[in-house]
From Swiss-Prot:
The lineage of its organism: Bacteria, Pseudomonadati, Pseudomonadota, Gammaproteobacteria, Enterobacterales. It comes from Escherichia coli. Residues 1-74, 246-270, 294-321, 422-489, 510-542 are annotated as: Disordered. GO terms for molecular function: endonuclease activity; metal ion binding; protein domain specific binding. This is Colicin-E9. One of its GO terms (biological process) is defense response to bacterium. This plasmid-coded bactericidal protein is an endonuclease active on both single- and double-stranded DNA but with undefined specificity. Residues 297-321, 430-453, 465-476 have a biased composition (Basic and acidic residues).
Length: 582
């Protein structure tokens, strides 16, 4: 594992333009119109007769084809759109297909659902380190959504009340305000080769503020979010949109908060849209995400995995802590599952015992009735005998008792099946908990070992003889060894942390004329301050530009933190390849 780059240029925080793993709730919104949906020709500001959908060209009537403003050669204030307006309820990702003039959406500005409000409230309470985090609302099935023509690729549109997510009311912003800080965003991310729509938080974020412009259609506005198709928007303040899933959009029932990925938001454009004051509409937050094809999802997942691996390599302590937190959360969930199944099993046993007692009593009643029949059986063929009536009564009792036994047997069989199922479920839950306990223990052990980097220690080891071009080997094999002359200077010295040790290594390099001979003036200045020198550009990867210290035997596997014979100097490119097993 790496000791890092010595510059602090990799803080461990993910980019705010990256992915999220997660968890979720959220239901997509159907783009269709139907009675009772809150979207029909009677309340549709886009026009289009009953049963006709929405038509933006051809036909008769002012502004709908050859009329003023809305034909292809009009002023453009009405738009030339062939798309059906997608009803969008706050917090519910909706599928929308662009037409010639952009995306048409009808935002239902009713109250935010309790489920979505709960997710936002939950995110505000979370304090995960090193990364943005979020909850998955929905997952996408690209094969059911993606089209061959890139210009007709469907989009996922999600809206939220702007004042619920901004740090200050939008109405208080200056008219020339270009951006606004937000507490959460709705972005796309990838996990397990599935594209998700997630609510993310945890890092400073801001989005553009754009003004909606009125069109010639009453109640219809246009807005341009940078990088997204033009939006043609109507706002419905009274009737809520239908909160049902669009084809290809699946509800994610897992509401867990998880770290967001490095590529979260990679195919999302969002903004706060401010309406004219005289419209009476409050500002809304709108997020527009591309629906990726299966190949695009795979490519992005590969990039996500690559960037995660790079980050883990230079942040082993943080990576171990993240894995431990995940393992601990999984164990907590496993404990809850065991407790729930124990409760189910206890109830099943109680019902089983009760049904068994009832069945035993019914069988006894039947046995008594049969015995009574036998007692009067000698009168069965003598209708005139006084005992014949008693024999008949005993037979009726036996019939009723048999019916009761049958019913009690059915109830007992059902209880026995539930008990068997509950026993099996409890056993499976306990086995899963055992696995999670082992995983949590392994993660804790690894964290404890990796945390040695942050603990004091004494430098050991002899290093190896090197020449003035020793850093040329940093991009080869296992990297360049710690020079023996540096090891002689540092051996037996105490260091507060591995960062202090790293700084001392480069300071000693700066004092050695031969080892620093081939460093350029800028790098000589860096090492004199204890900073790692820059590598050649072809050995740099992303933000990782300086030489790094790598433990040949990982600390998590028992490698010693301050053993200079276990430490190599590597370039970022070579360091990444080492951790990839190359």
């Amino acid at each position: 594992m790496s000791g890092g780059d010595g510059r602090g240029h990799n803080t461990g925080a993910h980019s705010t333009s990256g992915n999220i793993n997660g968890g979720p709730t959220g239901i997509g919104v159907s783009g269709g119109a139907s009675d009772g949906s809150g979207w029909s020709s009677e309340n549709n500001p886009w026009g289009g007769g009953s049963g006709s959908g929405i038509h933006w060209g051809g036909g008769s009537g002012r502004g709908n084809g050859g009329g003023n403003g809305n034909s292809g050669g009009g002023s453009g204030t009405g738009g030339n759109l062939s798309a059906v307006a997608a009803p969008v309820a706050f917090g519910f990702p909706a599928l929308s297909t662009p037409g010639a003039g952009g995306l048409a959406v009808s935002i239902s500005a009713s109250e935010l659902s309790a489920a979505i409000a709960g997710i936002i409230a939950k995110l505000k309470k979370v304090n995960l380190k090193f990364t943005p985090f979020g909850v998955v609302l929905s997952s996408l099935i690209p094969s059911e959504i993606a089209k061959d023509d890139p210009n007709m690729m469907s989009k996922i549109v999600t809206s939220l009340p702007a004042d619920d997510i901004t740090e200050s009311p939008v109405s208080s912003l200056p008219l020339d305000k270009a951006t606004v800080n937000v507490n959460v965003r709705v972005v796309d991310d990838v996990k397990d080769e599935r594209q998700n729509i997630s609510v993310v938080s945890g890092v400073p974020m801001s989005v553009p503020v754009v003004d909606a412009k009125p069109t010639e259609r009453p109640g219809v506005f246009t807005a341009s979010i940078p990088g997204a198709p033009v939006l043609n928007i109507s706002v419905n303040d009274s009737t809520p949109a239908v909160q049902t899933l669009s084809p290809g959009v699946t509800n994610n029932t897992d509401k867990d908060v998880r770290p967001a990925g490095f590529t979260q938001g990679g195919n999302t454009r969002d903004a706060v849209i401010r309406f004219p004051k005289d419209s009476g509409h409050n500002a809304v937050y709108v997020s527009v995400s591309d629906v990726l094809s299966p190949d695009q999802v795979k490519q992005r997942q590969d990039e996500e995995n690559r960037r995660q691996q790079e980050w883990d390599a230079t942040h082993p302590v943080e990576a171990a802590e993240r894995n431990y937190e995940r393992a601990r959360a999984e164990l907590n969930q496993a404990n809850e599952d065991v407790a729930r199944n124990q409760e189910r099993q206890a109830k099943a046993v109680q019902v089983y015992n009760s049904r068994k007692s009832e069945l035993d009593a019914a069988n006894k009643t039947l046995a008594d009735a049969i015995a009574e029949i036998k007692q009067f059986n000698r009168f069965a063929h003598d209708p005139m005998a006084g005992g014949h009536r008693m024999w008949q009564m005993a037979g009726l009792k036996a019939q009723r008792a048999q019916t009761d036994v049958n019913n009690k047997q059915a109830a007992f069989d059902a209880a026995a099946k539930e008990k068997s199922d509950a026993d099996a479920a409890l056993s499976a839950a306990q086995e899963r908990r055992k696995q999670k306990e082992n995983k949590e223990k392994d993660a804790k052990d690894k964290l404890d070992k990796e945390s040695k980097r942050n603990k004091p220690g004494k430098a050991t080891g002899k290093g190896k003889p090197v020449g003035d071009k020793w850093l040329d080997d940093a991009g080869k094999d296992s990297g360049a060894p710690i020079p023996d002359r540096i090891a002689d200077k540092l051996r037996d010295k105490e260091f507060k942390s591995f960062d202090d040790f790293r700084k001392a290594v480069w300071e000693e390099v700066s004092k050695d004329p031969e080892l620093s001979k081939n460093l350029n003036p800028s790098n000589k200045s860096s090492v004199s301050k204890g900073y790692s020198p820059f590598t050649p550009k072809n050995q740099q990867v992303g933000g990782r530009k300086v030489y790094e210290l790598h433990h040949d035997k990982p600390i998590s596997q028992g490698g010693e933190v301050y053993d200079m014979d276990n430490i190599r100097v590597t370039t970022p490119k070579r360091h990444i390849d080492i951790h990839r097993g190359k």
